[in-house]
């Protein structure tokens, strides 16, 4: 059975994390958020400026686009789980490096294990390559 306390524990660990140098430059680590029993999980690259300020995923410009996409698909933020490959904003919004992705990989794995979604939507190149390693999703 999925428990809120398990995700709450992971979220606390993320907020206190000091595994890499991003903890020096961040304002807030940004754990995933949403329905702990979601059938659909969205995984982005990393927090942006607004996410870093408020500690919540996808609340800036990308969040507005995601909200529109969710609405068009008949979904709501409360029905899905939203997270990122890395949990802290890289300086100047640069692409996360391999060390940063590796340091956050256990957090993401734990989130996915607890939520156990039926569908995982990868948002952008970083999440695609981090999860699938560049493998083709479908063949024509």
Where does each model-flagged region fall?
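Glycine/proline-rich loop-helix segments at beta-alpha junctions forming the active-site rim
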Residues: 77-78, 85-140
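The first long alpha-helix at the start of the GST-like C-terminal all-alpha domain
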Residues: 61-80
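Solvent-exposed, flexible loop/coil residues
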Residues: 24-26, 33-35, 62, 79, ...
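Short, conserved active-site loops that position catalytic residues or coordinate cofactors/metal ions
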Residues: 45, 84-85
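Active-site and ligand/interface coordination hotspots across diverse enzymes
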Residues: 1-61, 71-72
